[in-house]
Amino acid sequence: MKKIRVSLLTKVVIAIAAGVLFGQFLPGGIARIFVTFNSLFGNFLSFSIPLIILGLVTPAIGDLGKGAGKLLLITALIAYGSTVFSGFFTFLSGSAIFPHILPTNTELTAMENPEDFMLTPYFVVNMPPLMDVMTALLLSFTIGLGLSNISGTTLRDSFTDFKEIIIKLIEVVIIPLLPLHIFGIFLNMTVSGQVMSIITMFLKVIIVIFVLHVLLLLIQFTIAGAIAGKNPLRLLKNMLPAYATALGTQSSAATIPVTLAQAVKNGVRENIAIFTVPLCATIHLAGSTMKIVACAMAIMIMAGEPVTFSNFSGFIMMLGITMVAAPGVPGGAIMAALGILQSMLGFNETLQALMIALYIAMDSFGTACNVTGDGAIAVVVDKIAGKN
C-alpha cells in the first residue's frame, strides 16, 4: 500500500483548525497536557537555537569563500542586495499598510507573559542554552570567515558534519513536532478567548504579502531587463514554470532543474546558468525574507510593540546573512531566523510559534518568489560576465 505523504503546510493548517475546534470543549485538565508539551518543546527550541545558528551559519560562510572567484563574489553580493532590498521594501510597505488593517494593543500584548492569561503547564523543565544567540552569531561569523581563509580541511569537515547533525535535528525532531506545538498554542489561545483576532490577522497579512511578492518580482525583473537590455515581462513570463514548480515542491533546491532550463530560455549562457542557479537556490531568499519581515511586523503591531526603522534595519541586514544558512527543507528559513527574532526583536517562545505558523502558511509562494528571482539574478550575472 502506497504511503500517503502530507505536506507540512497541510499539517499546520490541520493543527490550527484542530486547536481552535478542540479549544471550544476540551476540559482544562486535558488541555494542560498539551500546554505542558508546549513548555517542554519551547524550552528545547530555545536550547537548540544557538546550536542551529552555529551549525548552519559557520559552514555556510566558510563554503562561500572556498574557491572564491570574482563571479562568485559578484553573485553573492547581488543575492544579498536583493534579499536586503526585499526586507526594506517589505518594511516600508508594511509600515504604510499594517497600522490601518491590524488592531493594536490587543490581548496579544499579554503574550509577553502568557501564564498571566493562559493555561499553565503541569511542570516545567529548564533547558538553558549553551550560549546566548548573539554569542552564537559572533562565533559563527568568526569561525566561518576563518574557514574561508585557510587551506586546512579538518575543522571545515567537522563543521560540515555538525551541519548534517543540525539538519537531521530540524528534519527529524523539530519539524515533525511543530504541528503539535502549533496545535497546543491555538488550543491555549482558544481557551483564553483571543484566537479569532489571530486568525483574522493571519488572513490579512497573507493577502498583503501575496501582493507585495508580485510587486517584488516585477521590480527584480524590471531591473534585470534594464541591465540586460531585454523585455522584463517576457523574462518574467519565461520563469513562470519555475514559479509553478516551486509552489508544489516548496523547495528551491528541488526546483533547480526547472529554474535552470528557464534561465537558459531567457538567453543566459548555460555555463553561467549552471553556476548561478544552484548558488542562488542556496543564498538568495528574497521571498522568505519578505515573509519573515512582514510577519514579524504584524505580530509586533498586534502586540502593541513599537515598529521602528531603527530596530528593523539591523534585523533586516542580519536576516540577509542568516538566510544564506537556511537549510533547504520546508520551514528551514524560519528555523534559521528564530535566533535573531529572539535576540534582536525580543520574540518569546509563544510569539516564535505564531511566526512559524504564519510563515509556513505561506511557504509555497515564498519559495516560488525565491526561485523566480533567481532567474533575474542569472540574467544580470550573465550580462556582467560578458564574453569571458
Give, region by region, the residue ranges found by the protein language model:
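Short amphipathic alpha-helical coupling elements at transmembrane boundaries
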Residues: 32-46, 157-172, 237-245, 261-265, ...
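Membrane-water interface of transmembrane alpha-helices in multipass transporters/channels
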Residues: 33, 69, 73, 195-203, ...
